[in-house]
């Protein structure tokens, strides 16, 4: 009698995982968002779904992955918009219309434009980029100032060490002179006696 794990993956769960991941690949979404979606449906963690996909399921769907990538490429060509900047709901609308599954209505266009308005604009990205550039320049200037201060302190330390060594040498010579004078006096006193 073999014992199976309580949390073992079933064929249906593997199939759901494959379908969702392939759909996300086709629509230009990320695998992580696919794993999160499957995780919610199966009450598993996204990490568990990712592990199952990478360790077992993906190997069985290589041709499906290639086909999904090809479809995504074709969809991008037809739409003329990079789906990286589009939310999933917009991708689904664009996907459906480009494949001829339905005609666009005014409501679809309005919905698309409202969602498009909510996505960060190129101007916002540019402003964020400029802000980050300024931060980098500020940090580089601060780093340069700290390096300069560090070099100044090193130079001062080196000069102090040299002065200290010179002072020790002078004191050593003075001590030797005092010792030699005392030795001279003692010898002279010894000779006189």
Curated annotation (Swiss-Prot):
Effect of knocking it out?
Answer: Disruption of the gene does not affect vegetative growth and has no apparent effect on production of heat-resistant spores. However, the mutation leads to a considerably reduced spore resistance to lysozyme. The mutant shows some changes in spore coat morphology. The development of outer and inner coat layers is not completed. The synthesis or incorporation of several coat proteins is affected. The mutant has a strongly reduced germination efficiency compared with the wild-type and the complemented strain when L-alanine is used to induce germination.
Q: Which PROSITE patterns match?
A: HTH_MYB
Regions crossing the membrane: none
The family database entries (SUPFAM superfamilies) matched by this protein are listed as: Homeodomain-like
What inducers act on this gene?
Answer: Transcriptionally regulated by sigma-E. Transcription also requires the transcriptional regulator SpoIIID.
Q: Coiled coil: present as a keyword of the record?
A: yes
In its UniProt entry, what is this protein called?
Answer: Sporulation-specific transcriptional regulator GerR
The gene name on file is: gerR
């Amino acid at each position: 009698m073999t014992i199976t794990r309580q949390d073992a993956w079933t064929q249906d769960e593997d199939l759901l995982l494959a379908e969702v991941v392939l759909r996300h690949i086709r629509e230009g979404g990320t695998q992580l968002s696919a794993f999160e979606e499957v995780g919610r449906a199966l009450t598993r963690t996204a990490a568990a779904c990712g592990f199952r996909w990478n360790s077992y399921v993906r190997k069985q769907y290589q041709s499906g992955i290639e086909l999904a990538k090809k479809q995504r490429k074709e969809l991008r060509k037809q739409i003329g918009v990079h789906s990286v900047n589009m939310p999933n709901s917009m991708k689904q609308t664009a996907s459906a219309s480009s494949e001829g599954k339905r005609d666009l209505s005014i409501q679809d266009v309005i919905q698309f434009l409202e969602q498009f308005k909510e996505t960060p604009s190129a101007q916002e990205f540019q402003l964020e980029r400029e802000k980050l550039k300024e931060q980098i320049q500020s940090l580089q200037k601060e780093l340069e100032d700290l390096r300069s201060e560090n070099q100044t302190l090193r130079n001062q330390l080196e000069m102090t060490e040299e002065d200290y060594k010179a002072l020790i040498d002078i004191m050593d010579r003075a001590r030797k002179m005092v010792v030699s004078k005392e030795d001279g006096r003692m010898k002279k006193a010894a000779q006189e006696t």
